[in-house]
Regions:
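Noncatalytic, solvent-exposed loop/strand surfaces
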Residues: 20-23, 27-28, 56, 75-78, ...
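Acidic catalytic patch
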Residues: 42, 69, 73-101
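Short, well-structured N-terminal submotif of metal-dependent ribonuclease cores
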Residues: 1-43, 54-67
Length: 150
């Protein structure tokens, strides 16, 4: 079985932004243990919005945001990042599984979990504590990365 990791928006954004957790996020993305590093169409949509918000708040420039966007596109084209579609079944899974989760998971975060579950990921990468807790409940056979002490 291939060693696959689904990367959510929190980890992807930290890897490409000047954030305190950037070294952790980069270590996850660049780890040689992965056969595939996967993001969903939803991850990419959230990433674009979050990057734009950083521009509007003055945390980064339009030029830097454009460079980051081009880097993501290149990683997708080169196959370093695999793109997973979001399908109707994922939305149905969110409605079906969310009531069984024992933490307050946002719909947007539950969609990441549904895509990772349907796609058979072996690992789930997030820097969001609540998202990781929800992942441990939904994706019981999946390991969360990175190991966080928080």
């Amino acid at each position: 079985m291939p060693n696959t990791v689904y990367v959510d928006t929190s980890l992807l954004l930290a890897a490409f932004s000047n954030e305190p957790n950037q070294p952790i996020a980069l270590a996850v993305l660049q780890s040689p243990q992965w056969d595939q590093v996967c993001v969903s169409d939803w991850t990419l949509a959230e990433f674009a919005c979050a990057l734009h918000a950083k521009v509007l708040r003055g945390e980064t420039s339009k030029g830097v945001a454009h460079t980051i966007d081009q880097t993501i596109k290149r990683l997708l084209e080169d196959g370093a990042l695999q793109r997973l579609p979001v399908i109707r079944e994922d939305y149905n899974a969110v409605r079906r599984v969310t009531p069984e989760i024992r933490c307050l998971v946002r719909g947007a975060d539950a969609l990441h979990l549904a895509v990772a579950d349907r796609s058979g990921m072996t690992h789930f990468a997030s820097l969001d504590k609540t998202q990781r807790l929800a992942a441990q409940q939904w994706l019981q056979e999946v390991s969360c990365v990175p190991e966080l002490n928080k």
